[in-house]
């Protein structure tokens, strides 16, 4: 029998009754910030054996897909987080604004409808249709109408409904716009609306008319650059994703007016041989490292590691024009042909860059490690430092490998060898910690001077890279530990364990390879590492690495700590890159305030806004990732535009009921093969095996298969390519025909048609 619940959140029903499934789901829906196991037990007054029953019931609801775990809280599956970015798109009959989340996973179905509450107060900024807002959302619990109401926290800049496209001149001299988004129709531009655009220019246009017949007309608003003569391809993604790339005059003025920091309130670390190790083409250097053996007899074989990070907080004060613009950008965005920095060059490449031989302010952490890599203690210091050397990764590695040059030779014994000695200890600690160790190399694009692709290669992963990475991880952990110890709020970098649904999907796939996967609370990064080690060197190594990667959650910023699953750390924050990440700047300010290192620490106001800031910078990070990925796709598609009808070796990189995505390993680019072009069989989508297999033959294609393909269609500005399959399907003994999946509409592809249509990923 279900317990009756009182009107309050606490629940004071009599003993001996347990809540029904519906009551549990209702509580989770109505209390999105309080629905942990402990809160549920308290709300329904469950004790002893009833708490064990509750745990089992919640697990069952998760297994059924009705609940999911998010930041140690239970939420209804497919629900919105409490703070979310929304796009306002319409009004209801009563005049209230309607919105949808700006990002929504396809697997969650249709995006929920959100009704925006009227703003309170005369000064409240009222959003309009077409604008983007940051809002707190509250479930309505209604079966019909909007699923949520929202209170607007911030209104972003109004997005212009402009079209991005290529300016074309036809043979008769008339002008056309070829939209970057292929679903949009071509546009006609009259000569007096061309705004000086030339053939091949990337332009932003405003549609000015659209009749019942003929193409719509437009006027050119902005000429963004020539695709023939300038590095303009990245500008497509910059504008498509509304990435701020031009600093306002007041921001530039503030940066230019900044003066070098003084020694006031700082320790003098200028005699410590800190060095920077970065990519050879790096322009800004925000971290420097030093290591020395620990002379304390109580720590035999130990090491003292110092990591110094550019003191950006000394120049970017909270609430300033620089600070507001940095938060708006969230992070620097890295394209193959350019960087869109978070901070102006005067700050990022000059005053804050830890240049060799020049005095620079820094926030340093000094850490003592035991011989087995355990961190024994650490301390933070606000310092003035002077980099002893600027080295590239390959240069430092060559010196350690016995090939020092004129610069690294004098540093080898006193500076480099102690660094590698400390890294050997930290590596032992990392091995004991057992973080997730995926082996999926990243590719780097090298461009010619004209901005076109020269080559694509996989950079070698050196110990020098791993050394810096591990030193930075330890510094980030120290920052989180210090702020937690001071009981101060902070923005964590959190990474949740895979959801139960993704775990089960992965478990089904691994079962086809006779590989077991631990369940629930026993699932740790080492569980995945054991599987990856078992398939290392086998035919399915790449396949298993890809599927394990897809099962993982996405790391985000959050004011609540749930730990970092991938790194296998209980607490983690970003501290080491304040030049290019706003999260790190917030952590710097928090440390300065917590440790009384200056008057420019975090304010009460910013502490109160950590929820909002975390949501903003998480969204900015996803925006940057999407823009970077799309730019690479466009560059590669442009590079291959002259190679239609050529054959390529490829690997299946994705499987859907609509067809196969294939990656060209030598270029790192993806294209699509529609299921309707695979042959005369009827292909069925096996989700658990990540495969399409023929109903008649039982043969098909699976994720990570090596195949031969032919390039048959290409749209360079959309970054889209369509291929034809040349390889014959192979037997797939692990695949299974699943009638119940097909009835849910997830498994079966469409019946083959005479002609397939390309689809953009």
Model-derived features: positions:
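Eukaryote-biased detector of low-complexity, proline/serine/threonine-rich segments
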Residues: 362, 705-708
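Charge-lined substrate channels and their catalytic hotspots, especially those that engage the 3′ end
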Residues: 2-306, 313-358, 390, 395-400, ...
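Electropositive polyanion-binding surfaces
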Residues: 210, 236, 240-243, 250-679, ...
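A generic structural motif
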Residues: 92, 141, 156, 171, ...
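A short macromolecule-binding patch
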Residues: 107-117, 184-189, 668-685, 733-734
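Acidic, low-complexity intrinsically disordered tails
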Residues: 1-19, 682-691, 725-761
């Amino acid at each position: 029998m279900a317990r009756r619940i009182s009107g309050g959140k606490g629940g004071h029903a009599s003993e001996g009754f347990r809540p029904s499934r519906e009551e549990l789901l209702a509580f989770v829906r109505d209390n999105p910030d309080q629905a942990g196991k402990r809160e549920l037990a308290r709300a329904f007054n469950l004790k002893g054996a009833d708490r064990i029953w509750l745990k089992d019931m919640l697990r069952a609801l998760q297994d059924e897909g009705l609940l999911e775990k998010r930041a140690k809280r239970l939420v209804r599956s497919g629900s919105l987080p409490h703070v979310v970015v929304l796009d306002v798109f319409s009004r209801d009959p009563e005049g209230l604004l309607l919105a949808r989340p700006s990002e929504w996973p396809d697997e969650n179905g249709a995006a929920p409808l959100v009704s925006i509450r009227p703003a309170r107060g005369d000064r409240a900024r009222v959003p309009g249709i077409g604008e983007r807002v940051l809002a707190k959302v509250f479930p309505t619990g209604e079966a019909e109408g909007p699923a949520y109401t929202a209170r607007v926290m911030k209104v972003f800049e109004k997005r212009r409904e402009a079209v991005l496209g290529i300016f074309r001149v036809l043979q008769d001299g008339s002008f056309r716009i070829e939209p970057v988004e292929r679903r949009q129709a071509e546009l006609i531009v009259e000569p007096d609306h061309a705004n000086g655009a030339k053939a091949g220019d990337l332009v932003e246009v405003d549609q000015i008319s659209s009749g019942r017949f003929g193409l719509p007309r437009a006027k050119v608003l902005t000429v963004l650059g020539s695709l023939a003569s300038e590095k303009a391809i990245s500008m497509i993604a910059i504008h498509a994703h509304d990435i701020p790339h031009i600093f306002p005059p007041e921001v530039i003025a503030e940066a230019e007016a900044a003066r070098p920091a003084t020694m006031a309130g700082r320790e003098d670390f200028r005699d410590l041989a800190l060095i920077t190790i970065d990519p050879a083409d790096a322009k800004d250097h925000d971290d420097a490292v030093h290591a020395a053996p620990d002379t304390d007899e109580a720590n035999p074989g130990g090491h003292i590691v110092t990591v110094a990070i550019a003191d950006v907080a000394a120049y970017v004060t909270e609430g300033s024009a620089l600070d507001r613009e940095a938060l708006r950008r969230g992070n620097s965005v890295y394209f193959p042909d350019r960087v869109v920095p978070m901070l102006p060059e005067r700050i990022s490449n000059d005053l804050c860059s830890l240049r060799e031989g020049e005095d620079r302010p820094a926030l340093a952490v000094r850490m003592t490690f035991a011989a087995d890599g355990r961190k024994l203690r650490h301390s933070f210091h606000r310092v003035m430092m002077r980099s002893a050397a600027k080295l590239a990764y390959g240069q430092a590695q060559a010196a350690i490998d016995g090939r020092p040059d004129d610069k690294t030779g004098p540093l080898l014994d006193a500076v480099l060898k102690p660094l590698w000695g400390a890294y050997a200890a930290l590596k032992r600690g990392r091995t004991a910690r057992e973080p997730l160790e995926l082996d999926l190399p990243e590719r780097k694009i090298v461009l010619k001077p004209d901005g076109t692709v020269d080559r694509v290669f996989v950079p070698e992963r050196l110990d020098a890279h791993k050394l810096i990475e591990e030193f930075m991880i330890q510094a980030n952990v120290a920052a989180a530990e210090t702020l937690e110890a001071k009981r101060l709020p902070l923005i964590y970098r959190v990474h949740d364990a895979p959801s139960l649904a993704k775990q089960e999907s992965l478990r089904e796939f691994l079962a086809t390879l006779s590989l077991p996967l631990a369940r629930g609370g026993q699932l740790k990064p080492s569980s995945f590492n054991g599987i990856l080690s078992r398939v290392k060197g086998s035919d399915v190594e790449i396949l298993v690495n890809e599927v394990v990667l897809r099962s993982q959650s996405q790391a985000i910023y959050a004011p609540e700590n749930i730990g970092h699953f991938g790194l296998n750390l209980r607490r983690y924050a970003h501290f080491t890159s304040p030049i290019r990440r706003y999260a790190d700047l917030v952590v710097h300010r928090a440390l300065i305030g917590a440790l009384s290192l200056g008057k420019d620490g975090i304010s009460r106001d910013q502490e109160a806004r950590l929820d909002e800031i975390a949501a903003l910078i998480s969204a900015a990070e996803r925006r940057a990732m999407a823009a970077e990925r799309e730019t690479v796709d466009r560059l590669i598609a442009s590079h291959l535009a002259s190679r239609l009808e050529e054959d390529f070796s490829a690997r299946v990189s994705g499987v859907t009921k609509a067809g196969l995505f294939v990656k060209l390993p030598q270029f790192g680019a993806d294209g699509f093969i529609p299921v309707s072009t695979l042959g005369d069989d009827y292909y069925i989508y096996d989700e658990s095996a990540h495969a399409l297999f023929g109903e008649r033959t039982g043969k098909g294609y699976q994720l990570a298969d090596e195949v031969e393909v032919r390039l048959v269609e290409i749209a360079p500005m959309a970054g889209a390519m369509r291929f034809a399959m040349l390889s014959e399907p192979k037997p797939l003994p692990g695949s299974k025909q699943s009638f119940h999946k097909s009835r849910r509409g997830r498994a079966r592809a469409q019946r083959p048609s005479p002609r397939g249509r390309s689809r953009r990923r």
